[in-house]
From Swiss-Prot:
<dbReference type="Pfam" id="PF00704">
    <property type="entry name" value="Glyco_hydro_18"/>
</dbReference>
<feature type="active site" description="Proton donor">
    <location>
        <position position="384"/>
    </location>
</feature>
<dbReference type="Pfam" id="PF00041">
    <property type="entry name" value="fn3"/>
</dbReference>
<dbReference type="InterPro" id="IPR001579">
    <property type="entry name" value="Glyco_hydro_18_chit_AS"/>
</dbReference>
<keyword id="KW-0378">Hydrolase</keyword>
<dbReference type="InterPro" id="IPR013783">
    <property type="entry name" value="Ig-like_fold"/>
</dbReference>
<keyword id="KW-0147">Chitin-binding</keyword>
<feature type="signal peptide" description="Or 32">
    <location>
        <begin position="1"/>
        <end position="29"/>
    </location>
</feature>
<dbReference type="InterPro" id="IPR036116">
    <property type="entry name" value="FN3_sf"/>
</dbReference>
<feature type="domain" description="GH18">
    <location>
        <begin position="264"/>
        <end position="597"/>
    </location>
</feature>
<keyword id="KW-0119">Carbohydrate metabolism</keyword>
<keyword id="KW-0326">Glycosidase</keyword>
<dbReference type="GO" id="GO:0006032">
    <property type="term" value="P:chitin catabolic process"/>
</dbReference>
<dbReference type="GO" id="GO:0008843">
    <property type="term" value="F:endochitinase activity"/>
</dbReference>
<protein>
    <recommendedName>
        <fullName>Exochitinase 1</fullName>
        <ecNumber>3.2.1.14</ecNumber>
    </recommendedName>
</protein>
<dbReference type="GO" id="GO:0000272">
    <property type="term" value="P:polysaccharide catabolic process"/>
</dbReference>
<keyword id="KW-0732">Signal</keyword>
Length: 597
């Protein structure tokens, strides 16, 4: 890739002002510095930066300069788009300090250019030139560092050449007002702005939506929560200043999306088809503390068949297994006590790939048969391993194209429609398929990444209005980058806090600020933890579980990770598994009961 190769030659173009090829005096007069706030004297105005700020020292001139710090997969890119003339020559220059600092231009319509320095302990000027294409009217200027290196500085960035016209950013919108407000959404409208080609909507200072007209509905909100909204007008010259702020408080939750669960619920998996070394636990013997019981597992007859079967544990493996009649009676007794009993599909060994519409339809019919036979309350999706992955051209989580993703979404929507509003739908993805999407999504822009990275995001997003609970498995995980751009590892409260904060705050997918996965409601989110050290890697002591809950629901007892909010409505704790918790003396259950009462 070009970013691995510095330019062999820095082109210094000289304009010859003679003969028929000479620029006219009018064109020469039009040459100007088109970079907005290239000296960073107005902070980051005009620039979009992933990890940048302005500082007063060191500076090359004036009183401010850019400081940007790469971290993880973020190279600390700062960019702005300027209006240019077609078929015109431009000179881009800037002064930088640091190691592996780049300056470049993209969208030129000819050959995009960049230049760099390996080491600049003092201010060093970088310069490059380009010619725009026959229809180019906008070019993006950028500077960035390199992954894993230290902070870099930039100052006095300029783009000299013919101006692209007199277009200026539009005026800020006026008349911003709220309309219909539900438990999870707020409708907004505003007055039109002359010269605007679109609008950007901000929630609590973060861009969350764009609109071509003068209205938008912001979704994915938490019930009974106050939000602040602003809107900016957009045209070819950029964004306006933001409008005046309006506030709205979402309506209280109605309980329809939470399937009548208690305000705080305990979720556990019951080994119903195997013992797994922890011993078999009869459903009737599960204590009343457990609000949602996931029967593990329904598995496919083959990976791509879509034909799901639920076979109860054989007596040879589980000598104390109850009869089918006793099992069904126990389900009814749990339901009469207000508990939810679900069939969980997948697990470590039950890979499910709905590669065809026929497999999709078979999935729906076979899962329905299990639900109907046992009178269950709903379905848990625990697809692991290679069940979900993204095709190379599938880059937008809001509009997936990969058959295994699309067919799963359609199947779950069909089941939800069949069984109605009381149908309980939960999911238990691994961090690799969800939070890793903050850094990587599918195979990536240049290919070569694991296609499973972030692959659950389109499923969660498409079903967010139907989803009762998402309990990501915060265990058996490698280090995952949080919203602080630091890697977090299992074994303490910080990992659970950082992973859950990502779900409740939302995050740019693969670092793309224009492609944000919206937050889930707090009442939809549970934290997945292993019940004992035998159950999985990443077990934490009860004190660490309490720290996690304190920080997320009360913003107390927090560690090094700074959350982006406080969520007293956080719904649940989930564990693998009820059997292992019994094996460990019910420690997980006692921690939950002791905290929530």
């Amino acid at each position: 890739m070009d970013r691995f190769r510095p330019l062999a030659v820095l082109i210094a173009a000289a304009l010859t002002l003679s003969g028929t090829t000479a620029l006219s005096s009018a064109a020469r007069a039009a040459d100007a510095d088109l970079a907005r706030n290239g000296g960073f004297e107005a902070g980051l105005d005009g620039w979009t930066c992933t990890a940048g700020t302005t500082v007063n020292s060191p500076v090359r001139s004036g009183s401010s300069a850019l400081k940007a710090t790469p971290a993880g997969s973020d190279n600390a890119r700062c960019a702005q788009t300027v209006t240019v003339q077609p078929n015109s020559q431009y000179t881009l220059s800037g002064h930088v300090q640091g190691s592996y600092v780049y300056l470049g231009a993209s969208g030129t319509g000819t050959t995009d250019v960049s230049t760099w320095t390996q080491s600049a302990p003092d201010w060093r000027q970088l310069t490059t030139t380009f010619r725009t294409g026959p229809s180019t009217t906008r070019v993006t200027l950028y500077t960035h560092g390199w992954y894993g290196t230290g902070a870099y500085h930039a100052d006095d960035i300029s783009l000299v050449g013919p101006g692209g016209g007199t277009e200026q950013p539009p005026a800020p919108p006026t008349g911003l007002r709220t309309g219909s407000v539900t438990a999870t959404s707020v409708a907004l409208s505003w007055s039109p702005v002359t010269g605007a080609t679109g609008y950007a909507v901000y929630r609590d200072g973060v861009k969350v939506a764009t609109a071509s007209g003068t209205s938008a509905t912001v979704t994915g909100l938490t019930p009974d929560t106050a939000y602040a909204f602003q809107v900016a007008a957009v045209n070819g010259a950029g964004e306006s200043a933001k409008s005046a702020t309006v506030t709205a408080t979402t309506a209280p939750g109605t309980g329809g999306g939470s399937a009548d669960l208690p305000p705080h619920a305990l979720v556990g998996y019951l080994h119903a088809s195997f013992a797994n070394g922890s011993g078999y636990t009869r459903l009737a013997d599960v204590p009343d503390s457990w609000d949602v019981i996931d029967l593990a597992f329904g598995e496919p007859t083959s990976v791509t068949s879509g034909d799901i079967r639920f076979d109860r544990c054989p007596a040879t493996e589980c000598p104390n297994v109850e009869s089918d009649a006793e099992f069904k009676a126990a389900i009814k007794a749990k339901q009469a006590a207000g508990k939810k009993v679900l069939i969980s599909i997948g697990g470590q060994n039950g890979q499910v790939q709905l590669t065809t519409t026929a497999a999709r339809d078979t999935f729906v019919s076979s899962v329905s048969k299990i639900i109907d036979e046992y009178g269950l309350d709903g379905l848990d999706i625990d697809f692991e391993g290679h069940s979900l992955s993204l095709n190379a051209d599938d880059t937008d989580f809001k509009n997936p194209k990969t058959p295994v993703i699309v067919n799963l979404i359609q199947a779950l929507k069909t089941l939800k429609a069949k069984y109605g509003d009381d149908f309980v739908l939960t999911m238990a993805p691994e961090t690799f398929f969800v939070q890793l999407g903050y850094q990587y999504y599918g195979t990536g822009k240049w290919g070569g990444q694991d296609p499973r990275a972030g692959a659950y995001l389109p499923v969660i997003h498409a079903l967010r209005d139907d989803l009762t609970l998402l309990h990501v498995q915060d265990y058996n995980s490698g280090p995952i980058m949080g919203l602080d751009n630091q890697y977090h590892s299992m074994g303490g409260a910080d990992f659970h806090i950082a992973m859950t904060d990502m779900l409740l705050t939302g995050f740019p997918v693969a670092g793309d600020a224009a492609n944000v996965f919206p937050p889930l409601r707090a009442d939809q989110v549970a934290i997945g933890m292993p019940a004992t050290t035998n159950a999985g890697n990443g077990h934490v002591a009860p004190a660490e579980a309490v720290k996690t809950l304190d920080c997320l629901t009360r913003k107390t007892n927090c560690g090094s990770y700074a959350t982006h909010g406080t969520w007293p409505a956080l719904r649940a704790l989930m564990t693998w598994s009820i059997n292992w918790d019994r094996f460990g003396g019910w420690e997980f259950q006692r921690t939950f009961d002791g905290y929530f009462g």
